[in-house]
UniProtKB/Swiss-Prot annotation:
Organism taxonomic ancestry: Bacteria, Bacillati, Bacillota, Clostridia, Eubacteriales
Organism for this UniProt entry: Desulfitobacterium hafniense (strain Y51)
Family: Belongs to the UPF0342 family.
Signal peptide positions on this chain: none
Protein name: UPF0342 protein DSY1594
InterPro entries: Bact_com_dev_regulator (IPR052767), Com_YlbF (IPR010368), YheA/YmcA-like_dom_sf (IPR023378)
Length: 131
C-alpha cells in the first residue's frame, strides 16, 4: 500500500468524522441512550425479536397474533421520536457511506460514466444496496 493512498484515506476518514451525518448520528444516539423510555422500548423490542427467533428455531409458524405483536412493536419503535430520529440519522449516514463506496467502486472499475453503480441503473456493478 502506498503512502499516497494511506494519506488520501486519512483525509477521507477525517472528512467523514467531521460530516454532519456522523455528528447527527452521534447526537441522536446519545439522546436515545439517555432516554429511559426509549431504552425500555428497545428492550421490549429485543425481547419480542428473541421470542420470534425461538419460535422459528423450533420450526413453529408465526401466528397472526404474533405477527400483529411484532408489527405493533415495530410501530412503537419507529414512532418514538428519539428512536425515530436516531434511525433517520443512521439511514443518512449509511447513504453517505454507500455513496462513497460507489465512488470508490467506480474508480476501481475505471468507469468514468459510473455505469452499474447507481440506484437508477442497479447496483450490480458496485455491490451497493439500493433502497
Amino acid at each position: 500500500m502506498t503512502a499516497e493512498i494511506m494519506e488520501k484515506a486519512e483525509v477521507l476518514a477525517a472528512a467523514i468524522a467531521k460530516s454532519v451525518e456522523l455528528q447527527n448520528l452521534r447526537s441522536t444516539e446519545e439522546a436515545m441512550m439517555a432516554d429511559e423510555q426509549a431504552q425500555q422500548i428497545i428492550a421490549d423490542f429485543q425481547n419480542e425479536q428473541q421470542r420470534v427467533y425461538e419460535l422459528q428455531a423450533q420450526g413453529q409458524e408465526l401466528t397472526d397474533e404474533v405477527q400483529q405483536a411484532i408489527d405493533a412493536m415495530e410501530a412503537k419503535v419507529e414512532g418514538y421520536p428519539p428512536i425515530a430520529a436516531y434511525l433517520q440519522a443512521q439511514e443518512q449516514f449509511t447513504k453517505m457511506l454507500d455513496t462513497i463506496n460507489g465512488v470508490l467502486a467506480q474508480a476501481i472499475a475505471n468507469d468514468p460514466n459510473g455505469g452499474g453503480c447507481s440506484c437508477d441503473t442497479g447496483c450490480s456493478g458496485c455491490g451497493g444496496s439500493c433502497s
